[in-house]
Amino acid sequence: MDPDAVAKAFVEHYYSTFDANRPGLVSLYQEGSMLTFEGQKIQGSQNIVAKLTGLPFQQCKHNITTVDCQPSGPAGGMLVFVSGNLQLAGEQHALKFSQMFHLISNQGNYYVFNDIFRLNYA
């Protein structure tokens, strides 16, 4: 499958799940996965989802601006870099964000091995 198509499909699935059913993200991570969220490192699928479901907002909408990807390693991994806007319910202004995913191929499916998220305040 075309890497750009895989990246686009992953990004659409990830953010639609985040916006509508954050606990559902658990299947995208494994116990060896790591999230760096605003500088805080969290390891393991359960811990990552606990962090994401514990954020101080319940409703949000991600609007994706760009998706870039590159193949990573001989085993079919992929780097995916995303930028966009995060609109929180009840807030007038959206927050700009960047997020990088390192996806690892596992029997025809992908899981998130590394995930780095930052809000962009500039």
From Swiss-Prot:
InterPro entries: NTF2 (IPR045875), NTF2-like_dom_sf (IPR032710), NTF2_dom (IPR002075), Nuclear_transport_factor_2_euk (IPR018222)
Keyword vocabulary terms for this entry: Acetylation, Cytoplasm, Nucleus
NTF2 domain residues: 6-119
Subcellular location per the Swiss-Prot or TrEMBL entry: Cytoplasm; Nucleus; Nucleus envelope
GO MF entries: small GTPase binding
Domain of life: Eukaryota
N-acetylmethionine, modified sites: M1
Listed PROSITE patterns: NTF2_DOMAIN
Coiled-coil regions, chain positions: none
Main location: cytoplasm
Tissue specificity of this protein: Expressed in roots, stems, leaves and flowers, and, at low levels, in siliques.
PANTHER family: NUCLEAR TRANSPORT FACTOR 2
Known role: Facilitates protein transport into the nucleus. Interacts with various nucleoporins and with Ran-GDP. Could be part of a multicomponent system of cytosolic factors that assemble at the pore complex during nuclear import.
Protein name (database record): Nuclear transport factor 2A
